[in-house]
Amino acid sequence: MTLWINGDWITGQGASRVKRNPVSGEVLWQGNDADAAQVEQACRAARAAFPRWARLSLAERQVVVERFAGLLESNKAELTAIIARETGKPRWEAATEVTAMINKIAISIKAYHVRTGEQRSEMPDGAASLRHRPHGVLAVFGPYNFPGHLPNGHIVPALLAGNTIIFKPSELTPWSGEAVMRLWQQAGLPPGVLNLVQGGRETGQALSALEDLDGLLFTGSANTGYQLHRQLSGQPEKILALEMGGNNPLIIDEVADIDAAVHLTIQSAFVTAGQRCTCARRLLLKSGAQGDAFLASLVAVSQRLTPGNWDDEPQPFIGGLISEQAAQQVVTAWQQLEAMGGRTLLAPRLLQAGTSLLTPGIIEMTGVGGVPDEEVFGPLLRVWRYDTFDEAIRMANNTRFGLFCGLVSPEREKFDQLLLEARAGIVNWNKPLTGAASTAPFGGIGASGNHRPSAWYAADYCAWPMASLESDSLTLPATLNPGLDFSDEVVR
């Protein structure tokens, strides 16, 4: 029984599904998808639970959410192993994900008060007040690269605001989704407040098509995000928050410390085996001898990166990709770039047939036309050389995406110029692209999202504002508008 609907674990009535470790092939999880009727059942449960949950005080809802944080802490080792085994990422990285989940609780509570709390301004004859109300029933679609942390970034602020939720994890990480749901169950969420439906495309389409849905919060690919946007078009009454990845540029201008710059680039491009929406996909490198030396060092260090299993000792920097198919897609993308005229500096290699262990790849595309503006979700870095900083900015902006942009340079003036001209929601200076703060908004423009940033701003799309003018008594104004006469003679 792998679905959690209205406070009960039930068996899915859809297709059967098996999840294996992407490196060892070990069977980790077996279950069945939710069919359309069970998705509707989850929605009815969430709708029925909404009035009571929304009427609780923030303090009462916060108690449950903080209890969940405590359970994350006490079950950290177990959840770390589940995430690592299911995604293929190393144990150390899965542990940082669980830590991020724990930290998200306090940050979300603070963000609720700052972004969507209550305000009151006194007036001579009363007060002006601002409150925020929950939308109602929200669907949350989770991705596979951070199956705990990223859905958590939607679920926690949505629950704090008073919404009820139907959560569909990625079909590639059902075990992690179930493990997190069981902790919410232990935290004491009332039946129907948070419901779990497992499944792939058919389950997702049934969920997003629900008429009685008040909103949908999504993290995933641009293709799926665009499909959801089209599906919900003409329904302005539903809140839609999309985070859809990027084709992110990292500009390496002047480099004082080559080793430090190489380290930053590897952290930006290859951490999580390149499976972060924030990963650098395009390296824009200044022409000249210094750039040549940097590139040679980058290739040499990257060549020594050997992916390993989640529990290997010593721990590897990267593990496997989410699946063998995902790894093969990266290899295919590299082969296509090479066929277009790209010059391979480091060829990505599948280390073992039947696994997702893929070494990083680096390919130079300077002077090659018609390169697809697509996000290759894996450890493949494309390199372009430039002559002037203005040219670098034009190249950085030459994408339909707009999530992340980074600059390595000792010159503050160039960063200031980039801040003015970059078309990206997050712009970093001498910091990895894969570094972002939960105390700041997270999101992009263009094909990277629909102007609903998450993290610190997630509270904004989890509630709507209600403004009020208030007075505890009603009296006739001392001064009336022209044409109004309330004299005793007229009244009688």
Curated annotation (Swiss-Prot):
The keyword Cytoplasm does not apply. Keywords: Arginine metabolism, NAD, Oxidoreductase. NAD(+) binds at residues 220-225. Its EC number is 1.2.1.71. HAMAP family: Aldedh_AstD (MF_01174). Belongs to the aldehyde dehydrogenase family. AstD subfamily. This is N-succinylglutamate 5-semialdehyde dehydrogenase. It comes from Shigella flexneri serotype 5b (strain 8401). The gene is astD.
